[in-house]
Curated annotation (Swiss-Prot):
Recorded GO CC terms: cytosol
Organism of this sequence: Methylobacterium sp. (strain 4-46)
GO biological process: regulation of DNA-templated transcription
This protein's name: Probable transcriptional regulatory protein M446_6579
Places the protein is found: Cytoplasm
């Protein structure tokens, strides 16, 4: 699968997550707290909170950490985070969307801008690249839960728009407002998904050469290393050879 799926595989290459586990847990805890504050602290009634808890479990975040993050929201503890979207261009003109949660807008903007500049990219105005992407709901399952035909049939019945299946798994996409209902229907059929999220899906994926691809990957790593950054979405794809090298 091209686009964000391939990129996620790069960003979670062997050893990287382990090296920054505390940072990963911190970002997951922040999303859980924000989701619980914006909705209700019950994941059965709050699709965003459920998705955040699912992501935390996928990273083996301890149950105590998850419960503590929810209590911060219900007890009125912790900072009040503002959700901000940044858009920009990387080497080769590739488009990037950055989602952040911050208690200091100026600090976060400075950090993100610095990462773009150091990598030869540029931070742009809001709306500069988002028109190249679609905001969609994503529900992902391991390949073993069903064959491609069964997943397609179930996804259509659940109200999804598209399904992509290969040896790495199944990705079901839907209108962003329908994510909760689609995810619930598919979970009843196939069990808990490995990921449920709102994502920015590129309308077209740009193939880049290995030199440019490596620069872009480094750029996204620099951005993701910022504590306030939650997600990075891109519209480029790299060669299998480069992906293999970067995963070593």
């Amino acid at each position: 699968m091209a686009g964000h799926s391939q990129f996620k595989n790069i960003m979670h290459r062997k050893g990287r997550v382990d090296a920054v586990r505390s940072k990963v847990f911190g970002k997951l805890a922040r999303e859980i707290t924000v989701a619980a504050k914006l909705g209700v602290p019950d994941p059965a009634m709050n699709p965003r909170l459920r998705a955040a808890m699912l992501a935390a479990r996928a990273e083996n975040m301890p149950k105590d950490n998850i419960e503590r993050a929810i209590k911060k929201a219900t007890g009125g503890e912790g900072e009040n985070y503002e959700e901000i979207r940044y858009e920009g261009y990387g080497p080769g003109g590739a488009a990037l969307i950055v989602e952040a949660q911050t208690d200091n807008r100026n600090r976060t903007a400075s950090d993100v801008r610095s990462a773009f500049t150091k990598a030869g990219g540029s931070l742009a105005e809001t709306g500069a690249v988002s028109f190249m992407f679609d905001r969609v709901g994503l529900v992902a399952f391991d390949a073993k839960v069903a064959d491609a035909d069964a997943m397609l049939e179930a996804a259509i019945e659940a109200g999804a728009d598209d399904v992509k299946s290969d040896e790495s798994g199944h990705e079901v996409t839907c209108e962003h407002g329908a994510l909760g209902e689609v995810a619930k229907a598919l979970e009843a059929r196939f069990g808990e998904p490995r990921r449920t999220a709102l994502v920015w899906r590129p309308q077209n994926t740009v193939e880049v050469d290995d030199e440019t691809g490596e620069k872009l990957i480094r750029l996204v790593e620099m951005i993701e290393d910022q504590d306030d950054v939650q997600n990075v979405f891109v519209n480029f794809a790299v060669s299998d050879a480069l992906m293999a090298r970067m995963q070593d």
